[in-house]
């Protein structure tokens, strides 16, 4: 998935999923707590792969147990209605400071959902060409050539 879309919550905490993403996610999909104050939306198939990786982690490692517990406790299976809307659970709204405006961004095989205020701060770093060069250098150091 790729692209960026802005949406607004309605009074019933419903949000319209961008059609482009809904095609990949399917009618029923999963929302999980992500990193960087984002929620992550995954298709059922992608969620099963993700779940298998989490379940295969070393349970003797306390940090892995805690992170796995946190992610599974903050996972919801959702189903879109005929208008492509889902209702965001209150705990997601509270924990991820989502009020009204939301930004969906494609992140490869999943999409992320941010409160607009949070995403705007993250995107601002890319207005600095030096920062982009630093991040590109990190990719290169990790074996990814652009």
Swiss-Prot record:
Q: Which cysteines are joined by disulfide bonds?
A: none
Q: What is this protein called?
A: Transcriptional regulator MraZ
Which GO MF terms are attached to this record? DNA-binding transcription factor activity; transcription cis-regulatory region binding
What are the UniProt keywords, alphabetically? Answer: Cytoplasm, DNA-binding, Repeat, Transcription, Transcription regulation
Question: What family is this protein classified in?
Answer: Belongs to the MraZ family.
Residues spanning the membrane: none
Q: How does it assemble?
A: Forms oligomers.
What subcellular compartments does it reside in? Cytoplasm, Nucleoid
Q: Where is the SpoVT-AbrB domain?
A: 4-46, 75-118
Q: Give the record's GO biological process terms.
A: negative regulation of DNA-templated transcription initiation
Q: Which InterPro entries match?
A: MraZ (IPR003444), MraZ_C (IPR035644), MraZ_dom (IPR020603), MraZ_N (IPR035642), MraZ_sf (IPR038619), SpoVT-AbrB_dom (IPR007159), SpoVT-AbrB_sf (IPR037914)
Main location class: cytoplasm
Where along the sequence do coiled-coil regions lie?
A: none
Pfam families in the record: MraZ
| Statement: the UniProt record of this protein carries the keyword Repeat | yes
- GO cellular component terms, semicolon-separated: cytoplasm; nucleoid
């Amino acid at each position: 998935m790729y692209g960026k879309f802005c949406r607004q919550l309605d009074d019933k905490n419903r949000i319209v999923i961008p059609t482009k993403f809904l095609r990949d996610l399917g009618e029923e999909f999963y929302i999980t707590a992500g990193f960087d104050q984002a929620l992550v939306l995954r298709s059922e198939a992608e969620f099963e792969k993700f779940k298998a990786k989490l379940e295969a982690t070393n349970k003797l490692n306390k940090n892995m147990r805690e992170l796995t517990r946190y992610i599974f406790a903050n996972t919801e299976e959702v189903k879109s209605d005929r208008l492509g809307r889902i209702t965001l659970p209150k705990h997601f709204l509270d924990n991820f400071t989502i009020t009204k405006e939301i930004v969906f961004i494609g992140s490869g095989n999943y999409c992320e959902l941010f409160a607009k205020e949070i995403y705007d701060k993250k995107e601002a770093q890319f207005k600095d060409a030096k920062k982009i060069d630093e991040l590109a250098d990190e990719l290169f150091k990790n074996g990814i050539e652009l």
